Amino acid sequence: MSKKLTKKQIEQLSQFTVDELLGVIHDLSEKYGEINQYLAMNYLMSPEEKLKNIENEYKRQFRKKGNYEYWKSHAFFLDLENKTVRSLDSLALGLPLETVKITEKMIGEADDLFEKYDTSSGSWQDYLYGLLNVWIKALGAAYKKDNQVDFVGHYLEVKSNCDYYFPSDLLQNNKAFVPREVIQKI
């Protein structure tokens, strides 16, 4: 069985009525639980509901016992990145202040998380660097939306809290989201 729909199959789907498509979606969601989550997260929730869902998922993952087995730890960080960081990335421009708040909390708790898991695979770095990129994107959007946001203060605080892990090229890689005057101040 192929993983992608062929052109012919897509053409057949385009000929379905709205009711037939709703029936297909309903059947799929009854048989496969992941489809329910995907539909809800990507199409049926407001941005505020998505943010709350992401925050709850992060709390659930953070409370897990921890594991020092290589592959389980590797899978944990990949899963955490997929379920939280990528979802936050889609909200960073729409809800910047809220995204900054939750990402700063997650960055602040990163060391506690790293102590509970084997970090030799390096997937923790993908998680953290993805999180830092979402944070800087949201912080830049919050600054552009409201110049009263203390971009430099937030930046220096997070940098000092995770200086060991902080990538030196973070601002350079996210120039599109960071105002020029802020880069000059830093």
Predicted regions: what they are:
Residues 1-11, 30, 34-186:
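Eukaryote-biased, non-catalytic alpha-solenoid scaffold regions
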Residues 18-28:
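Long, hydrophobic or amphipathic alpha-helical segments
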